[in-house]
């Protein structure tokens, strides 16, 4: 993240977000991350995966947006897709509840892993609103500038093409609802899938089936929410 020319970013996103890399907040964010690395702090996800959500789901391919907060802060977990973990890592509790709702809603078998890469490849933008975190220090990079960048991503997606689905789970994700044009898109909200709240309305929300129904009604191929075995 030292200069726009060196950022490995999928071309459609690089073009859409070009002006953001010239903003003062981005220079401050780069300097913050440089200082964190210089201090020997371990930052997740690894550098090449910071923009994995964008690189996995080009702008023209986006059908569904799921918002998370910040990356998992344990070793080998985060790989740049919200709620998702790298293969071989135990499925985190919130994702376990997402799988439970998929089973209830669409009778999809619960997979043996927590990697959601196949969703991203189909057009599900799995976007954390903060894209980095210090090891074992949740929310340590919140308020450092990423929020401006990811707010702009949400706006760009909302403006780019109609008939997308935004799944906003929990108060933090729902605080971004103002960035979405609800006259052009389907916005579905519920409590967060965390074990602390999932039984207060996440389980039973039917969001996955409702998302696919909306896409199909608008001539868009639905998401295959099944995850291949790894």
Curated annotation (Swiss-Prot):
GO terms for biological process: base-excision repair, AP site formation via deaminated base removal. Keywords: Cytoplasm, DNA damage, DNA repair, Hydrolase. It catalyses: Hydrolyzes single-stranded DNA or mismatched double-stranded DNA and polynucleotides, releasing free uracil. It is an enzyme of class 3 (hydrolase). The keyword Cytoplasm applies. Its EC number is 3.2.2.27. It is found in: Cytoplasm. GO terms for molecular function: uracil DNA N-glycosylase activity. It comes from the Bacteria. One of its GO terms (cellular component) is cytoplasm. The active site is at residue 70. The keyword Nucleotide-binding does not apply. Belongs to the uracil-DNA glycosylase (UDG) superfamily. UNG family. NCBIfam families: PRK05254.1-1 (NF003588), PRK05254.1-2 (NF003589), PRK05254.1-4 (NF003591), PRK05254.1-5 (NF003592), ung (TIGR00628). Excises uracil residues from the DNA which can arise as a result of misincorporation of dUMP residues by DNA polymerase or due to deamination of cytosine. This is Uracil-DNA glycosylase. It comes from Pseudomonas syringae pv. syringae (strain B728a). The gene is ung.
């Amino acid at each position: 993240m030292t200069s726009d020319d060196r950022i490995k970013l999928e071309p459609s996103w690089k073009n859409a977000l070009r002006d953001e890399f010239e903003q003062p907040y981005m220079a401050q964010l780069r300097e913050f991350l440089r200082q964190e690395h210089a201090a020997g702090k371990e930052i997740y996800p690894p550098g090449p995966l910071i923009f994995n959500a964008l690189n996995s789901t080009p702008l023209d391919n986006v059908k569904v947006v799921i918002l998370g907060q910040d990356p998992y802060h344990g070793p080998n977990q985060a790989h740049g897709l919200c709620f998702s973990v790298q293969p071989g890592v135990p499925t985190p509790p919130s994702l376990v509840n997402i799988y439970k709702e998929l089973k209830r809603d669409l009778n999809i078998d619960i997979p043996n892993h927590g990697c959601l890469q196949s969703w991203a490849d189909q057009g599900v933008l799995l976007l954390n609103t903060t894209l980095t975190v210090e090891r074992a220090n949740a929310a340590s990079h919140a308020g450092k500038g990423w929020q401006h960048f990811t707010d702009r991503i949400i706006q760009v997606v909302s403006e780019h093409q109609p008939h997308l689905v935004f799944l906003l789970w929990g108060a933090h994700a729902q605080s971004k609802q103002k960035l979405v044009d609800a006259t052009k898109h389907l916005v579905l909200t519920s409590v967060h899938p965390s074990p602390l709240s999932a039984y207060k309305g996440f389980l039973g929300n039917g969001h996955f089936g409702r998302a696919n129904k909306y896409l199909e009604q608008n001539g868009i191929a639905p998401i295959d929410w099944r995850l291949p075995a790894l």
